[in-house]
């Protein structure tokens, strides 16, 4: 349904849990830069009222760190499926705000360019994030989705939106 192929399933090491606390959930693992599991998300396979189930430990991690090239522009998105649909240097926030470890890693690695792609209900969060990064000297592009979701738009349309986005500053 989400448009992922066997290469995506293999790359992201997706799994399925058929019993236990994550019964009937697709498991989306996240790995740190050394390839060690640092977090995971369980997504209900049958679209119940409780779509996502997170593990009972803090999510202050760098999502999909294993796949990030810190010398290239990075793309910050809300969820794991958004990141997987964009693929290239895309990091899930596991929510609408940036947590300390990810923020620290961005600054530590002297990332020069960031694209922020959040749902329209997270506009204020995106502005706060943008301001923090601009104050660090990082160029930030805010990608407008017009009520759509990166996963719904698909890879090609998202890449077009990213390329057509403009840098933000607080002088305008």
Language model segments and positions:
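Acidic beta-strand-to-loop metal/phosphate-binding motif
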Residues: 76, 112-125
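Short, aromatic/basic amphipathic alpha-helical patches
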Residues: 125-137
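TOPRIM metal-binding catalytic domain and adjacent DNA-binding surface shared by DnaG-type primases
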Residues: 1-27, 31-34, 68-69, 104, ...
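A generic structural motif
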Residues: 139-149
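Short, surface-exposed amphipathic charged segments that create phosphate/polyanion-binding patches used
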Residues: 25-26, 107-111, 151-164
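Thiamine diphosphate
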Residues: 121-122, 131, 147
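Phosphate-handling DNA/RNA-contact segment within nucleic-acid enzymes
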Residues: 18-113
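Cofactor-binding loop segments of dinucleotide-utilizing enzymes, especially the Rossmann-like FAD-
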Residues: 79, 119, 145
């Amino acid at each position: 349904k989400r448009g992922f192929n066997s290469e995506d399933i293999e790359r992201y090491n997706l799994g399925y849990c058929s019993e236990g606390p994550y019964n009937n959930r697709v498991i989306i693992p996240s790995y740190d830069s050394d390839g060690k599991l640092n977090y995971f998300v369980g997504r209900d396979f049958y679209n119940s009222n409780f779509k996502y189930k997170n593990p009972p430990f803090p999510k202050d991690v760098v999502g999909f760190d294993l796949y990030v090239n810190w010398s290239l522009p990075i793309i910050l998105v809300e969820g794991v499926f958004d990141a997987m649909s964009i693929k290239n240097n895309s990091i899930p926030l596991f929510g609408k705000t940036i947590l300390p470890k990810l923020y620290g890693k961005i600054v530590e690695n002297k990332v020069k360019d960031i694209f922020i792609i959040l749902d329209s209900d997270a506009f204020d969060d995106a502005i706060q994030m943008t301001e923090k990064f601009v104050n660090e000297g990082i160029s930030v592009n805010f990608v407008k989705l017009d009520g759509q979701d990166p996963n719904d738009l698909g890879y090609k349309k998202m890449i077009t939106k990213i390329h057509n986005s403009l840098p933000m500053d607080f002088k305008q």
